[in-house]
A protein has these predicted regions:
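Acidic, Mg2+-coordinating phosphoryl-transfer loop and its flanking beta/alpha structural elements
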Residues: 161-199
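A short, structured active-site edge motif that brings together acidic residues
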Residues: 42-44, 125-140
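Short, acidic loop-to-helix structural element flanking the phosphoryl-transfer center
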Residues: 79-106, 112-116, 143
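Conserved Lys-Pro-Asp/Glu-containing loop-to-beta segment of HAD-superfamily phosphomonoesterases
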Residues: 6, 142-171
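N-terminal helical cap/lid subdomain that shapes the substrate entry/recognition surface
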Residues: 2-92
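Structural recognition of alpha->loop->beta junctions
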Residues: 122-133, 192-211
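Conserved H-loop
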Residues: 36, 62, 125-129, 156, ...
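Glycine-rich phosphate-binding loop signature in dinucleotide/nucleotide-binding domains
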Residues: 2, 100-102, 153-157, 214, ...
């Protein structure tokens, strides 16, 4: 197998620890739409999926109010987003990969401008080869963005690894032909992530250990 050269990072839930914050945002806006509040992380994990439109459907959002809910969610999310922490070891892991000579790219379903603003909040925007988000706020698939990037970068898919926190990350990795490891600290539970058939770990440190072990084995 080709030696790992490039890490494709998911952002929300993987480097950014915004699970609890996302629940707070939902509970802040849903009453205005006469929708029920979330009562636990477990309930959120049961409902969350990609594309986000399907997640909203599971939460009771109809097509008629989808746009209104999406815009209200985004406005509330941005209001205090500077209070969201990074996951433990996020910066250390990015730096660890840099020292190991790996290229790193953020590949996110977040809207591009928002994504860049968030990375700037943590002083991370200069640590990645590319910052790739979507052109809208609806958090759809990021497969096409990732495919275009790999084709343009010259990095073979077999030399890249996706690190994420959702089944969608594993689906994107499979479609692109990259390796994948999932971290069960974000928007989907460990039980759900195990359905992907890829390694699942409980911390970024363990994810980094796995990536670097794979890199050495391939070398």
């Amino acid at each position: 197998m080709m030696k790992i050269e490039q890490v494709l990072w998911d952002w929300n839930g993987t480097l950014l620890d915004d699970l609890e914050y996302s629940i707070q945002v939902r509970n802040a806006i849903f009453p205005a739409f006469h929708l029920p509040l979330l009562e636990s992380v477990e309930e959120y994990h049961r409902q969350f999926t990609f594309p986000v439109r399907l997640y909203y459907q599971r939460a009771g959002v109809t097509d008629e109010i989808f746009d209104d809910v999406a815009h209200a969610w985004m406005a509330e999310y941005e209001r205090c987003m500077d209070t969201i922490p990074l996951h433990e070891d996020a910066v250390k892991t990015v730096e660890r990969f840099r020292r190991a000579g790996l290229g790193q790219t953020v590949l996110s379903a977040s809207e591009q401008t928002l994504l860049r603003r968030q990375l700037a909040l943590y002083g991370l925007e200069g640590r990645f080869d590319a910052i790739l988000g979507r052109g809208d706020i609806y958090a759809g698939s990021k497969e096409a963005i990732g495919r275009e990037y790999l084709q343009g970068s010259g990095v073979p898919a077999e030399a890249a690894v996706m690190i994420g926190d959702s089944l969608h990350d594993a689906e994107v990795a499979r479609a692109l032909g990259t390796r994948c490891i999932l971290v069960a600290r974000g928007h989907q539970s460990r039980e759900t992530l195990l359905e992907a058939g890829v390694p699942v770990v409980d911390s970024l440190r363990k994810a980094a250990d796995w990536v670097l072990e794979q890199k050495e084995m391939d070398g």
